[in-house]
Regions:
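Noncatalytic carbohydrate-binding groove/subsite architecture in carbohydrate-active enzymes
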Residues: 1-107, 117-119
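Aromatic- and carboxylate-lined catalytic core of secreted/periplasmic carbohydrate-active enzymes
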Residues: 96-184
Length: 184
């Protein structure tokens, strides 16, 4: 796999890497997609496919990381949305389905549990890096002082992911649905 690309940025880096021969040495390329509107995935995957085709059409595309938070006070990507556990579950389902409708080899969800992002911490100052990202399908349980106690509780997104995983656990083939009208 040849690295991960943040699709919110232009593909200039990937183009430059392919231009100096990277495409000859990789089997797949991964992208990370943190977006509120999952429909942008279609054009981003199409653009990435076009770039790969120019240098090596055999390269597979992997959606290596995406997700959303379940609280609006979290740290990390997409932290400024009015997120709730219900909105997180809906976004998880919409984004996974959008991924599966493209040609990605597989799709990944970030993450299994809420965790410390440690984006602005100072070494030796524990309180400075207790900044949680609430991306998990399992929610961290906190004590009265706001510290994680090491227990995790399933969120609605956990059950959504469990259900969609069960639906697609066997051999599944993508099929185009007819969206036109039947002539009379």
């Amino acid at each position: 796999i040849g690295g991960a690309i943040c699709m919110a940025k232009p593909l200039d880096f990937a183009y430059d890497a392919f231009s100096v021969g990277m495409g000859e040495h990789i089997d797949a390329i991964s992208f990370h997609e943190y977006v509120i509107d999952e429909t942008v995935v279609f054009r981003h995957v199409k653009a990435l496919r076009g770039l790969c085709n120019r240098f090596n059409p055999n390269i597979e595309i992997i959606q290596g990381e995406s997700g959303s938070q379940s609280r609006s006070d979290g740290r990390g990507a997409m932290r400024k949305g009015a997120w709730t556990p219900h909105k997180q579950a809906k976004q998880l389902l919409r984004h996974l389905m959008a991924d599966l409708m493209t040609e990605v080899k597989f799709t990944s969800y970030f993450s299994c549990m809420d965790m410390i992002e440690a984006l602005n911490g100072t070494v030796g100052d524990l309180v400075s890096y207790l900044d949680y990202g609430y991306f998990g399908v399992l929610g961290a349980d906190f004590d009265a002082q706001g510290r994680s106690v090491g227990n995790y509780t399933p969120k609605p997104s956990y059950y959504a992911l469990q259900t969609i995983s069960a639906i697609f656990s066997e051999d599944v083939q993508k099929a185009d649905l007819y969206t036109g009208t039947v002539p009379i």
